[in-house]
Amino acid sequence: QSLIEADINNGNSYILEEEGKAVATFAFIEGPDITYNNIYEGKWKENTLPYHVIHRMASLHGTHGVFKDILEYCFERCNNIRIDTHRQNSIMRNALSKYGFEYCGIIYLLDGAERLAYQQTRIESNNK
């Protein structure tokens, strides 16, 4: 609960609504994230640009399309996004792959828990 309270107090907590009903929530936090300082068995695809992190994403059961909506919102604000998930979370891992995130390696949370780390960087070309 303290992480969620901190997200709210810091202005990093977001709710996605459909027809006036909250259907999803997530935290969108400007980096650097201390747990992303060290990555194992891989490397970040882009490690020089500022980045944001998506954390604590959840949606109501039976809700569809919210991940895409969350990503659109986040990429409008930052073109370099990192996210992590549990090894066992095959639904999230498949969604990350579907929406263009690349697996980068393993990170460890402050409590030592392992997470699989992903990144997507969208660099717009000046040649239009």
Stretches found by the model and what they are:
Residues 1-13:
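Active-site rim helix/loop that mediates acceptor-substrate recognition in acyltransferases
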Residues 11-28:
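Conserved beta-hairpin
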Residues 27-62:
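Conserved acyl-donor/pantetheine-binding loop and adjacent beta-alpha core of acyl/acetyltransferases
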Residues 53, 76-88:
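Conserved GNAT acetyl-CoA-binding A-motif
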Residues 54, 92, 115-117:
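Charge-biased, low-complexity intrinsically disordered regions
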Residues 59-76, 93-98:
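Conserved acetyl-CoA-binding loop-helix of GNAT-fold acetyltransferases
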Residues 88-105, 113:
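Conserved active-site alpha-helix within GNAT-family acetyltransferase domains
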Residues 109-128:
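C-terminal "cap" of GNAT-fold acetyltransferases
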